[in-house]
């Protein structure tokens, strides 16, 4: 079921991309009037481009050239508020074999992941990482709970989705959005805490 859902997400992104494409003649006219506005480099990396407000690959071998890019693409999309181009998503899923022990222990990859995890909109990017398989391959313990069901009154989603929603809930508490319902923990989260120590176990 998860594979079907993941493929559907890629297909929907592709259909939306095709729907948003202007007619060829109009596209050429706009390109002449506003050169360089449709495709440009992503701020912070030469390996990715912005393609119709979606992050895409500057070259087909960016992941093979530097496997850290499998994590970096998500952080850059998060920082620049970009959606994901379907071609990029498809290439990510085909490059999962590059996520090995060396990448899991890479300082830069771990730094980027922790920045993703502790950002305000972490759940959006974590969910996309999960859909492409990157999250489960990068954090092997998480990979074991992907698509796992627990049949009781407290679990309406798969365990992996519940974990991602827990990160979202923790972020809401930290922003003070649950002050009325959870005053004590809200005050604690506003104090001097190690955010990495708090967020990582929740995931």
Question: Where do the model's predicted regions map?
Answer:
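Catalytic-loop motifs flanking and including active-site residues across diverse enzymes
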Residues: 69, 162, 199
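Poly-acidic low-complexity segments
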Residues: 66, 85-87, 176, 190-198
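Amphipathic alpha-helical
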Residues: 158-168, 173-174
């Amino acid at each position: 079921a998860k594979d079907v859902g993941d493929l559907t997400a890629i297909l929907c992104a592709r259909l939306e991309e095709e729907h948003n494409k202007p007619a060829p003649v109009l596209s050429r006219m706009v390109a002449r009037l506003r050169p360089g506005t449709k495709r440009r480099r992503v701020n912070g990396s030469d390996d990715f481009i912005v393609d119709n407000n979606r992050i895409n690959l500057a070259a087909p071998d960016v992941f093979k050239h530097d496997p850290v890019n499998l994590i970096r693409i998500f952080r850059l999309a998060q920082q620049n508020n970009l959606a994901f181009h379907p071609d990029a998503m498809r290439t990510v899923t085909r490059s999962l074999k590059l996520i090995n022990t060396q990448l899991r222990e890479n300082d830069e990859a771990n730094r980027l992941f922790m920045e993703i995890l502790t950002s305000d909109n972490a759940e959006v990017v974590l969910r996309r990482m999960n859909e492409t398989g990157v999250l489960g391959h990068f954090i092997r313990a998480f990979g074991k709970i992907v698509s796992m069901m627990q049949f009781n009154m407290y679990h309406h989603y798969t365990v992996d989705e519940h974990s991602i929603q827990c990160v979202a809930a923790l972020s809401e508490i930290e922003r003070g959005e649950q002050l009325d319902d959870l005053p004590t923990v809200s005050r604690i989260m506003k104090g001097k805490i190690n955010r990495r120590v708090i967020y990582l176990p929740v995931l």
